[in-house]
Amino acid sequence: GNLIIVVNDNDMSIAENHGGLYGNLKLLRETNGQAECNLFKAMGLNYIYVDHGNAVGDLIEAFQSVKDSRKPVVVHINTLKGKGYAPAEQNKEVWHYNGPFHIETGEPLYEMTEEDYSDISMNYLLDKMKKDPAVVAITSGTPTVMGFTEDKRKEAGKQFVDVGIAEETAVALASGIATNGGKPVYGVYSTFVQRTYDQIAQDLCINNSPATIVTFCGSVYGMNDVTHLGLYDIPMMANIPNLVYLAPTTKEEYLAMLDWSIEQNEYPVGIRLPGGSVISDGKEITKDFGDLNKYEVTQKGSKVAVIGLGTFYGLGKEVAEELKKVTGTDATVINPYYITGIDAELLEELKKDHDVVITLEDGILDGGFGEKIARFYGDSDMKVLNFGLKKEFLDRYDVAEVLKENHVTKEQIVEDIMKFI
């Protein structure tokens, strides 16, 4: 049939290319498509090469020549990433994704001076690598998710591995490294976790390989277009046996969890980074995360218990303050740390002097953290209210509007609590 496959070859992924496929593309570019070794012809496909892929006239000519083809055909076009804008041509990796900028100079309109989890991760891992050659950072085509710009990748050397845009391969590689005594850390955007599900379950967790997966932008405050949403990783990762999925609320908690995860050899571990601005309170973290599923009561009260997971722990504290102001009730506030398990002892203890437990999570409710708490109390008189997002696809959304529509503002939450106290 008339199947036309367009290969837009700009000699780049997001960063530089990795993998055997690109070697053949390079050979074809260098020979103007004439190399005898041709992956596409080996598959039985017809093939034509367009050397000036940014030239509209050449493209029209190429497509006219194949539009009536009776066999599947590959149109391999050699293009320049960032073509037509000098700053983008000169720094292709940085310009793959960019914020608002001055078109005359390419300089950003807004200087980002705040610390972020990408740089925090990179600085920690580079220091760890220098002390321990077993530590390996892994990315799947998005090296700057962990802060590894080109210069930092060179500094890390062989202890940094980019498998290309192949998240499945990254997890399988991490499992293999961990099984053989290495200490792999795979950084991935939450939105791409669905690509890894089979490997997390089959390669990583069945083998109980002690690798670390750090998920970035898993939050309503993360990327906000429909194909890049970080709202669904909790139901995916929190329900795979053997996996320990953690939710830090601060920089200090994250680094403590990361250090524990790298050094332990009992569990595959995921760490879901908070959304929004980095919170750093300078608090020394002495918790043993190997003592699984032990939550922390950060404020002791009665009647109402607020369990705020990850990003929404801060919202939980605000809810407790608002509840005190409106009703005079001192609520208990809990940092659960663990997404994958419940602290049955603590939850049982709450029955003695609490009537309502609320859960807050930065993601969809269906299959999420709050439902685990609700299930625990299912045969008791405890009222459980789960707050989070409904199951839907969002696109180019306003965070404040989404939170309000889902009844996840401190005022709305307190209104709901007041119905039961």
Residue ranges with predicted function:
Residues A62, Q199, M257-L258:
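Short beta-alpha junctions and helix-cap segments that line functional grooves
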